[in-house]
Amino acid sequence: MESSKQKRCRSSVVETIEAPLPLVWSILRSFDKPQAYQRFVKSCTMRSGGGGGKGGEGKGSVRDVTLVSGFPADFSTERLEELDDESHVMVVSIIGGNHRLVNYKSKTKVVASPEDMAKKTVVVESYVVDVPEGTSEEDTIFFVDNIIRYNLTSLAKLTKKMMK
């Protein structure tokens, strides 16, 4: 952990996806397959645990993620802190890698949309992260929010394709 004097920031990104909750959750909860919808992820190798896959225990699983070239990092090591299939909550922490997202922790919550509970899903991804030295809180939030927004847009496209 960094010094308690380290500046931290937090934000949330909300995306409504035109797909039923069970489909959206089945993709999001697959800790061992982030590349299914996270387009900056080139590959994922499970270091420990089952990643929440069928028959595998999820909580405490650790994955090594290789990122695509051109991204401002090469790899990330991440731990699944919580995976709750009843409340549709997933918590992930970044515990290593060659990036600037120190002490990053995200919580993703999935709920059926009040507009159309059978056909729409609302995904809320909230996070907290240290503000890297030499960077502003606003720039950090802008960067992370855009990655999350891109991933959730990709998730929406994937679910739409799967429903055809």
Swiss-Prot record:
Location within or outside the cell: Cytoplasm; Nucleus; Cell membrane
Region (START-like): 3-160
Short sequence motif named Gate loop, residue ranges: 69-73
Disulfide bonds, paired cysteine numbers: none
Main location: cytoplasm
Residue numbers marked as site, Involved in ABA binding: 144
UniProt-recorded Gene Ontology molecular function terms: abscisic acid binding; protein homodimerization activity; protein phosphatase inhibitor activity; signaling receptor activity
Any one Gene Ontology BP term: abscisic acid-activated signaling pathway
Record site feature (Involved in interactions with PP2Cs), residues: 72, 136
Keywords: Abscisic acid signaling pathway, Cell membrane, Cytoplasm, Membrane, Nucleus, Protein phosphatase inhibitor, Receptor
Signal peptide (residue range): none
Coiled coil: none
Residues where abscisate binds: 73-78, 100-106, 125
InterPro entries: Plant_def-hormone_signal, Polyketide_cyclase/dehydratase, START-like_dom_sf
Motif window: Latch loop: 99-101
GO cellular component: cytoplasm; nucleus; plasma membrane
Effect noted on mutating residue 38 to K: Becomes an ABA-dependent inhibitor of PP2Cs, including PP2CA, ABI1, HAB1, and HAB2
Alphabetized CDD domains for the sequence: PYR_PYL_RCAR_like
Domain topic, free-text comment: Upon interaction with ABA, the 'latch' and 'gate' loops change in conformation leading to a tight dimerization and the creation a surface that enables the receptor to dock into and inhibit the PP2C active site.
Family that this chain belongs to: Belongs to the PYR/PYL/RCAR abscisic acid intracellular receptor family.
Known function: Receptor for abscisic acid (ABA) required for ABA-mediated responses such as stomatal closure and germination inhibition. Inhibits the activity of group-A protein phosphatases type 2C (PP2Cs), selectively PP2CA, in an ABA-independent manner.
Subunit-structure text: Forms heterodimer with PYL10, thus antagonizing PP2Cs-binding and ABA-independent inhibition of PP2Cs. Homodimer. Binds ABA on one subunit only. Binds to CARs protein in an ABA-independent manner, both at the plasma membrane and in the nucleus. Interacts with PP2Cs such as PP2CA, ABI1, HAB1 and HAB2.
Protein name from the UniProt record: Abscisic acid receptor PYL13
UniProt source species: Arabidopsis thaliana
